[in-house]
Amino acid sequence: MKPAVPALAIGLLALGLMFHAEVVAAVGVWISSTAYNHCFLVIPIVAYLIWDRREVLVGAMPHPVAWVAIAALPIGAVWFVADRVGIMEGRQLAAMAIVELLFLAVLGWRLYYALLGPLLYLFFLVPFGAFITPALQDITTAFTTHGLDLLGIPNYTDAYTIEIPEGTFYIAEACAGLRFLIAAVAFGCLYALLMYRSWQRRLIFILISIVVPIIANGFRALGIVALGHLLGSAEAAATDHVLYGWIFFSIVILLLVVLGLPFRQDQDNRVALAWNAGQRTASSRTLISAAAGVFVLAFIGPLSAALFDRASAAELPAKPPML
């Protein structure tokens, strides 16, 4: 695998420069939003996951498949559409897909597949998911309302506002559980990669890590409203709602660990794959050419966007002279 490192480094640097706006925007969200602070841990986690597979990768050599670079054309088209409509998340996801394509083109099918889990984990670098916040608010509000009905607590719901005799609660965007959901899914994917070897078990556990935090957030919101009813004051119950949230998140993570632990698969019996040692190792020129092919075809999208912007600017009417 070591011969591929220079080509990957050059390719990643070139793509980083090409998509620098996406990188800057992503890091800005990591810093400003608590829902995405965990993104700073993604690259160290990926590095550890690759290191954890060192026994399987013994003797692994890259066999580039340069022709897969053609997939950069439709991905670039997706990036272009996202750029035209102003969806930064779409641009970032397309850019990350190009990065995945770079790894595939340089490493080859077998080596890429051996590293598929860690490499796909790189998608957590993209701060996506904000678009589901209204849906999460709907789910949390409905869960809380039905829970109050079951508990016999009088309530009136208008959109995301829940009124009880003791006061009013509002299911704000921050209360929808997005940050808990994203963090739980990131943890669930990491746990699945470390504890399971079969893709079936990994997929099941990841699905569980999506469902459990959504339900848990509903219980959290219901608990806060019910506590306000018991205390006789909505303000008193909502005072420490952030603390309650982190306690619930800790419980969710513990619950996921407990649910997944009995089904873990032993990782100690992993052996190095047969890497066809008799095949010739690809030259540095071949590896760099594969990376260059991905870069050149991916560059068509940003280049087209720049040309469109220049043409649009040229069509704008000139400002009248100042008097």
Model-derived regions, located:
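Hydrophobic N-terminal alpha-helices or hydrophobic patches in metabolic proteins across all domains
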Residues: 1-323
